[in-house]
């Protein structure tokens, strides 16, 4: 029996010890470079999220922009880019977070979302 999404999983490259020893980095550039893989990834995510009732989709820099923007378009929703500290040109709000290998901060424009909006967050991974 084939596991769900096994076809997509096979398109993702694993790079051991990146960016640090002991970390298994899942490189989705191979999935993104495959027209079937990218299309199916977006279609399947959109199908699963269609009934969630989100108002917007947010994608975390940088690969979250690719998948998140495509999913937002497929769902007919607006897209909110979540950027690393200091990258957005307008006034921002942000949040610090921890990684396996350090800390960082992400920010959005202060007017990117309204109070009470339900936002679907997409990234390529969660460390």
Spans of features found by a protein language model:
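PRPP-associated nucleotide enzymes
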Residues: 1-127
């Amino acid at each position: 029996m084939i596991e769900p999404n096994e076809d997509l999983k096979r398109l993702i490259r694993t790079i051991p010890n990146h960016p640090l020893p002991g970390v298994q980095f899942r490189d989705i550039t191979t999935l993104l470079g495959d027209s079937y893989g990218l299309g199916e990834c977006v279609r399947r995510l959109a199908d699963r999220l269609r009934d969630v009732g989100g108002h917007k989709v947010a994608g975390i820099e940088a690969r979250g922009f690719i998948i998140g923007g495509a999913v937002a378009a497929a769902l007919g929703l607006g897209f909110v880019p979540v950027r690393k500290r200091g990258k957005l040109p307008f006034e921002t709000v942000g949040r610090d977070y921890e990684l396996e290998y350090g800390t960082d901060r992400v920010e959005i424009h202060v007017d990117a979302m309204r109070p009470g909006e339900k936002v679907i967050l997409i990234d390529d991974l969660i460390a």
